[in-house]
Amino acid sequence: MRYLKKVTIYISLLILTIFIGGCGFINKEDSKETEIKQNFNKMLNVYPTKNLEDFYDKEGFRDEEFDKGDKGTWIIRSEMTKQPKGKIMTSRGMVLYINRNTRTAKGYFLIDEIKDDNSGRPIENEKKYPVKMNHNKIFPTKPISDDKLKKEIENFKFFVQYGDFKNLKDYKDGEISYNPNVPSYSAQYQLNNNDNNVKQLRKRYDIPTNQAPKLLLKGDGDLKGSSVGSKNLEFTFVENKEENIFFTDAVQFTPSEDDES
């Protein structure tokens, strides 16, 4: 009887230890997810900024990488990539460098096509069309004979102008990844088609699928904050060997260069 009692106590303690250890692991995962969200909030709090000229007066994260007197440059990028079944992969998007020192903004609209050659090796064909921004409007800086393309450029809106992440804290059950050696980190969430950001993307782009996307928050660099490294958003609607549909976006605050574009 005494032996059975000892065995029962031992088993109970073992179960309790496993339970506590499991809770510790869960808490550790939750803690890392919270830390990643807090890190991304430093970038996502600029969403939405409807008037791009507001970036001239927005201060970003600064560290020793910035020269004294350098007000910094915002780099914003939005790009939609599609690869229908049996067709080539095409990306269309824009990059804009908003220099707070000179209060000027320039960049380029890009069209990137990737297809396989006869040997199955990918061939990339990228075209860039230089642009500038004045009074919150985008203008090509060189003549464009294609009126449809010219209109697409002039009507382009960056995701930061209409995206909104005030409910980021409500995103739950993310797939968390963290590698302190790189360092790199990410959090991925399954969204639904009622999500406001998903609705906004569908409103502006022809997205030929009813599948709700996954949102990936992906970054590298010091998780506690650094101007070195990058942070990216990716909405993946379809991803397989035959078909791909995804939207990528990034907003970075960096030391200014003499000629960013």
Swiss-Prot record:
Membrane topology listed for this record: Lipid-anchor
A GO cellular component annotation in the UniProt record: plasma membrane
Signal peptide: 1-22
Compartments reported by the entry: Cell membrane
Record carries keyword Lipoprotein: yes
Cited PROSITE patterns: PROKAR_LIPOPROTEIN
Keywords recorded for this protein, A-Z: Cell membrane, Lipoprotein, Membrane, Palmitate, Signal
Predominant subcellular localization, coarse grouping: membrane
Residues carrying lipid (S-diacylglycerol cysteine): 23
InterPro entries for this protein: Csa, Csa_sf
Lipid positions (N-palmitoyl cysteine): 23
A Pfam cross-reference name: DUF576
Domain of life, per lineage: Bacteria
Gene3D superfamilies referenced in this protein's UniProt entry, alphabetically: 2.50.20.40
Family: Belongs to the staphylococcal tandem lipoprotein family.
Protein name in the entry: Uncharacterized lipoprotein SERP2422
Species for this entry: Staphylococcus epidermidis (strain ATCC 35984 / DSM 28319 / BCRC 17069 / CCUG 31568 / BM 3577 / RP62A)
